[in-house]
């Protein structure tokens, strides 16, 4: 797979569009709607994409060859000469190798008219200066550089992904759709995990409340038991507790057990119950699940 980098805001905007259409209109999103949001690749090194046809082809079919040119300017010099200044390179083009290639073309006389070649890059940005003879047309030299060097390069787009463990070339909408399906799976698993943990904790708190309501008897049972197992079994039998609840009680030191504040436990339990209700609502309603992903 070879997918060019994109502007994150545009990609997120497209995913949000898919979610909104499902929630508000109960329909799929068209590729045309996606193309209104995602304008094209966003190469971090800059460069200029030549033509829009290849971009649309990539988004519609999952395959295309996108031509990218360096950003250049022709600057007149004080001595009457011109120079070509390169300030942005096509994606993945190595600056040092590019300069070597230009020098090689000049040395082999495949390009005639370049008198000096300098890397003037600094912390302000990338800059390559190509000085020319007075008698040459800078546009002709520039076109020769596009032809023979990576000042013009091709990015081959292949939007390949595993779908049901099978490689498949996807268009842009399909790629975003499967990404959203993955997010649905991730959020569902996470919510089930959070629900399970919240229910486990609530279950323990319910046992602690029972223990507090019968604190003297609980302490008597623990002190009168030969070992932890006997204490746990006695608590389970007398107060109809589960093994997890009774284990949580016997695991606490008596000082900690007697120091528990019922109001704090009840407050935590009430908060947990809200979360439990929220988790269950998310798992029961696809639109709520999509809203969680969106936010």
Predicted regions and their residues:
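C-terminal interaction appendages of subunits in large macromolecular complexes
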Residues: 2-295
């Amino acid at each position: 797979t070879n997918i060019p980098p994109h502007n994150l805001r545009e990609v997120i905007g497209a995913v949000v569009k898919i979610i909104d259409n499902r929630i508000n209109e109960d329909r799929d999103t068209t590729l045309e709607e996606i193309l209104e949001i995602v304008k094209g690749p966003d190469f971090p090194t800059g460069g200029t994409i030549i033509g829009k046809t290849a971009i649309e082809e990539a988004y519609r079919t999952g395959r295309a060859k996108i031509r990218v040119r360096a950003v250049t300017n022709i600057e007149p010099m004080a001595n009457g000469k011109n120079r070509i200044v390169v300030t942005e390179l096509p994606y993945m083009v190595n600056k040092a190798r590019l300069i070597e290639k230009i020098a090689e073309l000049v040395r082999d006389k495949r390009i005639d008219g370049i008198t000096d070649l300098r890397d003037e890059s600094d912390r302000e940005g990338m800059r390559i200066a190509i000085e020319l003879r007075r008698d040459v047309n800078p546009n002709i030299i520039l076109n020769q550089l596009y032809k023979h060097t990576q000042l013009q390069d091709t990015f081959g787009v292949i939007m390949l992904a595993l779908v049901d463990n099978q490689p498949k070339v996807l268009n842009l909408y399909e790629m975003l759709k499967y990404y959203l399906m993955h997010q649905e799976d991730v959020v569902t698993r996470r919510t089930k995990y959070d629900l399970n943990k919240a229910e486990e904790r609530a279950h323990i708190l319910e046992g602690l409340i029972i223990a507090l309501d019968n604190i003297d008897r609980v302490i008597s049972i623990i002190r009168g038991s030969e070992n932890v197992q006997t204490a746990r079994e006695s608590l389970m039998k007398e107060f109809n507790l589960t093994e997890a609840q009774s284990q949580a009680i016997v695991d606490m030191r008596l000082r900690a057990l007697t120091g528990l504040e019922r109001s704090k436990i009840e407050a935590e339990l009430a908060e947990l119950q809200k979360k439990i209700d929220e988790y269950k609502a998310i798992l029961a309603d696809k639109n709520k699940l999509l809203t969680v992903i969106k936010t």
